[in-house]
A protein has these predicted regions:
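Acidic donor-binding segment of Leloir-type glycosyltransferases
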Residues: 2-40
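Short, conserved loop/helix-junction motifs that constitute active-site signature segments
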Residues: 3-5, 58, 85
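Alpha-helical structural signal in soluble globular domains
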Residues: 26-30, 57, 83
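Well-ordered beta-strand positions
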Residues: 9, 60-62
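Walker B catalytic motif
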Residues: 68
Length: 184
């Protein structure tokens, strides 16, 4: 909330029927004192539908979509509005992401075909399409490993740490997530 500007809207989407009451309790604390909007939609093992519902719930000209297990660098949040204004003809912006997995071994790296740099960043810059113009023709497709379609122009933010989303997890969570994706 510290980077929220006057016209900004924060929309949090919860997986209908699969979100704990403790999550709702935290969201209620924030929504009582801000412009936080909470929407529910069933994930139903379909990430594209889930993201499209979130997109439909947003009213701004652009959407900066961040997953629940990510957070943006402070510099990125401080400059994102300026980046969009300077490039307002761009439909989508690809944002670099720093992935770090605590407990990752060489065996995991080999098994999943990952690249890990000297800073222990996995597959850096791992660009994600996360800033998008809020127009009907742009939407997500594919149940898993979803892709954005309908955009006419795109731009990539610099692969500098200050422009990154940060995505941290431990190896147990990563293994569980990979197994889940394999079932879809």
């Amino acid at each position: 909330f510290k980077n929220k500007r006057g016209g900004d809207e924060i929309v949090v989407q919860c997986d209908e029927g699969n979100t704990s009451t403790s999550v709702y309790d935290v969201l209620k604390q924030f929504s009582d004192n801000s412009d936080l909007k909470v929407v529910e939609f069933p994930l139903n093992n379909n990430f594209a539908d889930f993201k499209n519902n979130l997109k439909d719930a947003c009213s701004g000209n652009y959407i900066f979509q961040i997953d629940a297990d990510e957070y943006p660098d402070d510099y990125l949040m401080a400059t994102v509005e300026e980046v969009i204004k300077m490039n307002n003809s761009v439909d989508v912006f690809w944002v670099p992401r720093i992935n770090k997995v605590d407990g990752l071994t060489q065996e995991h790296i080999n098994k999943w075909g990952w690249n890990v740099d000297s800073s222990k960043r996995v597959n850096f810059p791992d660009y994600q399409c996360r800033i998008l113009k809020n127009v009907k023709r742009i939407k997500w497709k594919n149940k898993v490993h979803e892709v954005l379609i309908g955009h006419k122009s795109e731009s990539y933010l610099p692969a500098n740490d200050e422009f990154c989303l940060i995505h941290l997890k431990d190896i147990e969570r990563q293994e569980k997530q990979n197994k889940y994706y394999d079932t879809l």
